Amino acid sequence: MSEDTVPEAASPPPSQGQHYFDRFSEDDPEYLRLRNRAADLRQDFNLMEQKKRVTMILQSPSFREELEGLIQEQMKKGNNSSNIWALRQIADFMASTSHAVFPASSMNFSMMTPINDLHTADSLNLAKGERLMRCKISSVYRLLDLYGWAQLSDTYVTLRVSKEQDHFLISPKGVSCSEVTASSLIKVNILGEVVEKGSSCFPVDTTGFSLHSAIYAARPDVRCAIHLHTPATAAVSAMKCGLLPVSHNALLVGDMAYYDFNGEMEQEADRINLQKCLGPTCKILVLRNHGMVALGDTVEEAFYKVFHLQAACEVQVSALSSAGGTENLILLEQEKHRPHEVGSVQWAGSTFGPMQKSRLGEHEFEALMRMLDNLGYRTGYTYRHPFVQEKTKHKSEVEIPATVTAFVFEEDGVPVPALRQHAQKQQKEKTRWLNTPNTYLRVNVADEVQRNMGSPRPKTTWMKADEVEKSSSGMPIRIENPNQFVPLYTDPQEVLDMRNKIREQNRQDIKSAGPQSQLLASVIAEKSRSPSTESQLASKGDADTKDELEETVPNPFSQLTDQELEEYKKEVERKKLEQEQEGEKDAATEEPGSPVKSTPASPVQSPTRAGTKSPAVSPSKASEDAKKTEVSEANTEPEPEKPEGVVVNGKEEEPCVEEVLSKGPGQMTTNADTDGDSYKDKTESVTSGPLSPEGSPSKSPSKKKKKFRTPSFLKKSKKKEKVES
């Protein structure tokens, strides 16, 4: 070692708070157990802890949804690579190994093929409701396999997809009941020809389907048929006595038909004999020395019949083997031992049943579907009756009285902001009236009597249903579900299309009366039953009658006869002549006053008549005008005198007051005479003109617009002045 290289002093290690072994006490039993554990066990526990995180991720529903979304995206792009296939296998594995809602059965299955293997791309070409039908039929095949009723051949379950096209679903030949899936089913027509091939490459058993096609042709009401030939059913079909009413299950089966089946239904005579034996209402067909076929309007009903049929056959076979013959058996009488109807229990003369009607065997079938889902079969069944009932509130918020506290607990959080609290309050107000125990009705009450029309004006108020006098029978319905009145089995896409159509009409401001009822098209309702409709119609009718009274003036001569009209015309002419004579007498008695006396008088009170806008009309010219005009106005009053500064039709009066006063008494009298003559000519032309059909003289088109009429009190004062003078 050289002299230059001198070892440096080692720095002390950093101070640590606590060592690993200092954390445990040597006397701790848990520490001693971990220390004495073998190394391989310790390594296994570490690996399990690492795998636990991976299992949690794989079993999370969010990861599975994200994976399915990724698969659908790649499928839309059309990339059918091996990566997509691997992702789909992972998704199926995750769904099959996920935790069930209920505890799993004691039966141990390492891996099973899911029933609902239809993906989004596969279900686009299916008919309406066909996806659910495929899942139901595949589930029935799995149930037959689980109960041990499946045979290697001729055990077929068929379902009618559509009555219009006569398409049916059947499993392919060579596929066992435990392998049938929704996508592997084949769609065929009534002749057994393939319409839509499934995911498998196996053909259709036309010989086995011939029996089903003959049944469907003979019974159009049947939608599902299950062919069963277990040892018990085959043994009962070989007995001459047939199925005996030994047990309660035999009574639940119902009527049965017996047919000698030779294995084929190719000839027309065999189909006719089958139709005669089957009848219009029978749901069980016994094939002699072969087996039985259960029919049903639905899949649930057909499986219900098969289940009780198999149980009845097993009971009968066991009873006959132990009793030694039919004479030692006690048979049930159909009249005394009646089976209970579906969904009802009769006791003490009353019937108790569910509020919601259910199909035959629906509850039992849903229970079996829940069992398959818990086992991991992924049935894809749509449940109508949920297993866990939602907790209902015993007291509504309306029934609970309002309470206020003036203090805040220390453990309470930060107070809710005002805006957020206001939004929550609005949301509660929207749902408060839907959850209220009280029922309110909109009622129109007569408020007051209108002054002109005299009809009561309705006033809209809200009253409790108990206080309102019901005009029609019925009971109020409490809305518990926003989709309470939506019909069942409706297509959501049709609802969305209709909503978009209505919104488009609102944007374009297109208003119509809405869809018209074909049933009520010819019915004419005398009176609307809706109070709001009555109030709207009443107010609208009052407004219409008021407008008509204001716009149209009644004709006073509409209800007079021709004779009365003639008398009225004569009376009008007589009054005209009297007025003319009085006017002539007044003109003759008038005397021209001195200019000194007439100066202080106003122009209206002067004896001179203001010149009219139109020139004086001669008698000849007046007669010509009367001939030209068909109707003239019956106006016998003298021409009105104009005050000073009056403007008529935008023009000043031609003769001024100063000019009239400057002319003198002689000219004033001559003007008055000429005015009287022209006035007389006018009255003659008026009286000589024809009358209108209403009996009143019409206005002449040649006559100018009227000027200001002299008030009556001024005329009286003028006469008084003349008498005084």
Swiss-Prot record:
Q: Please name the SMART domains in this protein's record.
A: Aldolase_II (SM01007)
GO BP annotations, alphabetical order: actin filament bundle assembly; barbed-end actin filament capping; hemopoiesis; leukocyte migration; leukocyte tethering or rolling; monoatomic ion transport; protein-containing complex assembly; synapse assembly
Domain of life of the native organism: Eukaryota
Compartments (UniProt record): Cytoplasm, Cytoskeleton; Cell membrane
Q: Where is the composition biased (Polar residues)?
A: 596-621
One Gene Ontology cellular component: postsynapse
Q: Where is the composition biased (Basic residues)?
A: 701-725
Q: Could you give the domain comment from the record?
A: Each subunit is comprised of three regions: a NH2-terminal protease-resistant globular head region, a short connecting subdomain, and a protease-sensitive tail region.
Supply the PANTHER family for this chain: ADDUCIN, BETA-ADDUCIN
Self-association or partners: how does it assemble? Answer: Heterodimer of an alpha and a beta subunit. Found in a complex with ADD2, DMTN and SLC2A1. Interacts with SLC2A1.
Q: What is the protein name for this chain? A: Beta-adducin
Gene expressing this chain: Add2
